[in-house]
Curated annotation (Swiss-Prot):
<dbReference type="InterPro" id="IPR002876">
    <property type="entry name" value="Transcrip_reg_TACO1-like"/>
</dbReference>
<protein>
    <recommendedName>
        <fullName>Probable transcriptional regulatory protein Bphy_2064</fullName>
    </recommendedName>
</protein>
<dbReference type="GO" id="GO:0003677">
    <property type="term" value="F:DNA binding"/>
</dbReference>
<keyword id="KW-0238">DNA-binding</keyword>
<dbReference type="Pfam" id="PF01709">
    <property type="entry name" value="Transcrip_reg"/>
</dbReference>
<dbReference type="InterPro" id="IPR017856">
    <property type="entry name" value="Integrase-like_N"/>
</dbReference>
<comment type="similarity">
    <text>Belongs to the TACO1 family.</text>
</comment>
<keyword id="KW-0805">Transcription regulation</keyword>
<dbReference type="GO" id="GO:0006355">
    <property type="term" value="P:regulation of DNA-templated transcription"/>
</dbReference>
<dbReference type="Pfam" id="PF20772">
    <property type="entry name" value="TACO1_YebC_N"/>
</dbReference>
<dbReference type="InterPro" id="IPR048300">
    <property type="entry name" value="TACO1_YebC-like_2nd/3rd_dom"/>
</dbReference>
<keyword id="KW-0804">Transcription</keyword>
<dbReference type="GO" id="GO:0005829">
    <property type="term" value="C:cytosol"/>
</dbReference>
<dbReference type="InterPro" id="IPR029072">
    <property type="entry name" value="YebC-like"/>
</dbReference>
<dbReference type="InterPro" id="IPR026564">
    <property type="entry name" value="Transcrip_reg_TACO1-like_dom3"/>
</dbReference>
<dbReference type="InterPro" id="IPR049083">
    <property type="entry name" value="TACO1_YebC_N"/>
</dbReference>
<keyword id="KW-0963">Cytoplasm</keyword>
Length: 242
């Protein structure tokens, strides 16, 4: 089935992540620590930790850094005791935004998130005010030109729920979040390497932005992304590639 154009947005996201590699590593270390603290330090019995470690390797994080983060999480090394807090809100035009944070000071974090929303024309909502507009899924994006039929066969055999061909020729594979690591391994064994692979909150519908509104919306998203305590920002805003 056809879908919205994704490729330019994904390339922009990857470039931004590469430009902020130090911040990406900091976020991943937090995620590894929390995953290890909650589910133990064995990646074979802790799917969340396996996902976090895989993401760390994809970001070229050294193995020593990963192991230290795991040890902090399970209590072998002193480290900050982070808690996970989700904030929900709206951007201009009523676009839905979810902000996932890990923090050792929730008073600081909520103040910073609220300030970013208000500074750039948005406002914070209550718990559950927008999360119902998203689905929690595993998502893989493959470059235009990827053999569609072979990818579809491999994906469905691996346990994927859906395969979507976008208008720009890129292909999305969607799977249950708990099956993400299994599907990722099966696709790579079949010879398919995704340009983007993540467990995410996927919007059920999108709100299109262009021109000045797109610029304003991007400023809000960037302000939230740049906060130290923010791990992920999800939105149903589809910003045109200018």
């Amino acid at each position: 089935m056809a879908g919205h154009s994704k490729w330019a947005n994904i390339k922009h996201k990857k470039a931004a992540a590469d430009a902020k590699k130090g911040k990406v590593w900091t976020r991943l270390i937090k995620e590894i620590q929390v995953a290890a603290r909650m589910g133990g330090g064995d990646i074979d019995s802790n799917p969340r930790l396996r996902l976090a470690v895989d993401k760390a390797y994809d970001a070229n994080m050294p193995k020593d850094n990963i192991n230290r983060a795991i040890q902090r999480g399970v209590g072998g090394v002193d480290g900050a005791n982070y808690e996970e807090i989700r904030y929900e809100g709206y951007g201009i035009g009523g676009a839905a935004i979810i902000v996932d944070t890990m923090t050792d000071n929730r008073t600081r974090t909520v103040a910073e998130v609220r300030h970013a929303f208000s500074k750039f024309g948005g406002n914070m909502g209550t718990d559950g005010s927008v999360s119902f507009m998203f689905d929690h899924v595993g998502q893989f994006l493959f470059a235009p030109g990827t053999p569609e039929d072979k990818l579809m066969d491999a994906a469905l055999e691996a346990g994927a729920d859906d395969v979507v061909t976008n208008e720009d020729g890129s292909i999305e594979v969607i799977c249950p979040p708990n099956d993400f690591s299994k599907v990722k391994a099966a696709l790579e064994t079949a010879g398919f390497k995704a340009e983007l692979a993540e467990v995410t909150m996927k919007p059920q519908t999108e709100v299109e932005f262009a021109g000045d509104d797109a610029v304003k919306m991007q400023k809000l998203l960037d302000a939230l992304e740049n906060l130290d305590d923010v791990q992920e920002v999800y939105t149903n805003a589809a910003i045109a590639d200018e």
